[in-house]
Structure formats: C-alpha cells, structure tokens
Regions:
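The feature marks the mature, well-folded catalytic cores of soluble enzymes
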Residues: 1-144
Length: 144
C-alpha cells in the first residue's frame, strides 16, 4: 500500500457519519413568499416606516401631515415640487439644510426591507441622501 492509499484509507475509516452532525436548515432569501407585508415587516425591523396617503389626500398634504415641523423639503420626483428641487442643489453645504428628501426607487428588496437608489434617482447628488434628516421613498408595490 502506498502512502497515498494509506492516508486515504485512514480518512475513510475516521470520517464521521453524516447523522452525527446534522446541518442546520438555512432559510432561502429568494423564497416565493415575497409580499408587501413581508417587505413592510423587514423595513420596520431596519427602523423604517410605511407612510400611505389617506383617501382623498394629495401627496403634498401627506408630506405635510407626516412632517409638520420640517421646513426644507427637497424633491427629486416630478409630481411634487417641495420647497427645493434636487436639481438645484449644487454642493453638500446646500444639502445640509434639507430636512426631507422625496425620491422614487426603481425597486425594493422584500427579503431585506430595503430600497435601491442610484445616481439616476438622486441626479448624481448622492450626498443629499446622506445629509438629509428623512428620506421619503416612493415605491410601487409591483416593483417589490
């Protein structure tokens, strides 16, 4: 018997049985139960909130209801002007005054309760998202 065969034989003889060490079950991230409810639960676990417009309420009224004390509301969406347009911010010093940023996300990740924002949504002004106090993300349920 060669040394290689001897080593392999020892390994085979000393291998533990698979029943001795049962592997834990791992939840799959891509489960097919990707629902709005699951997204909201995961978002809340991260410290986020789901804000919905009340019946008959226009978007600007919903923002005013949710953020009554905030003065500088920056918008990156065409359906809401806010007090400042994101395109008009040219420096981080200007963004430092922003209380609320309103932006649209192309998709949300149900499994983690997070949303995707890129340079496109932030008009290449990513620093605004880091400096603002609150971010309102518009997200369609079909994009979860």
């Amino acid at each position: 018997m060669t040394s290689r065969e001897e080593i392999l034989a020892r390994l085979r003889n000393n291998r533990p049985h698979s029943t001795d060490y049962v592997l834990p079950s791992l939840p799959l991230l891509g489960e097919r139960t990707a629902t709005r409810q699951r997204f909201e639960e995961n978002l809340k676990a991260l410290g986020g909130q789901v804000l919905e417009q009340q019946e008959g309420e226009i978007f600007s009224e919903a923002i005013a209801r949710c953020f009554p004390d905030e003065k500088v509301i920056c918008s990156a969406v065409p359906e809401f002007d806010g007090t400042l347009r994101l395109e008009n911010i040219t420096s981080p010093q200007q963004a430092d005054k922003v209380d609320v940023l309103v932006v649209r996300s192309p998709f949300g990740i149900v499994e983690t309760g997070s949303v995707f924002l890129s340079e496109k949504e932030l008009h290449h002004r990513n620093f605004v998202a880091h400096l603002t106090q609150h971010i309102v993300v518009l997200l369609s349920e079909k994009n979860l």
